[in-house]
Amino acid sequence: MLQISDVHTSYGQIRALRGVSMAAEEGKLTCLLGPNGAGKTTLMFTIAGILRARQGSIKLSGVELVGSPPHQIVSSGVVLVPENRLVFPDMPVRENLLAGAYLRLSDRAEVDRDIEAMMERFPGLRQRASQNAGTLSGGEQQMLAVARALMARPKILLMDEPSLG
């Protein structure tokens, strides 16, 4: 489903990824393991379109993602939960979830059903639905970040340091 071939990514003159190739199969859990500085986050940012690959190919179900803007990559089904969570601190939990479905807002009834499903899946969020996300504990913010990402109905969920929090 996700095929990465000979990907090279740089931060200016610093070459961070050199010839990375891997595949992630549908229905399988794929983990990237390595020490700090190995390029795990850089690879996820490159897949998500936040960083641009200088060379190589990233395909989701045969469709090339390299060169696509991040919002288009999200539309294609790839969603990133970054290491630092990046919840909207001044917005309530419910609105954070709604933000995760921003590309699907044309069907508000379906989005509302998905919000309810996230409240069921992550019960701690229900009791905090009207509470600003910035007041949640680190673990609760991580839970919210994952739930918000799932609101986009991803085919691939990229999670950077998912147990941090």
Q: What residue ranges belong to the model's regions?
A:
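ABC-type ATPase nucleotide-binding domains, specifically the catalytic core motifs of the NBD
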Residues: 12, 30, 68, 91-110, ...
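The feature captures the beta-strand-to-loop junction immediately N-terminal to the Walker
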Residues: 33-35
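Conserved catalytic motifs of ABC-family nucleotide-binding domains
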Residues: 153
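Helix-to-loop junction immediately C-terminal to a conserved catalytic motif
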Residues: 48
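ABC ATPase C-loop
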Residues: 149-150
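Conserved ABC transporter NBD signature motif
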Residues: 56-65, 76, 110-115
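Conserved ABC ATPase signature
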Residues: 132-136, 140
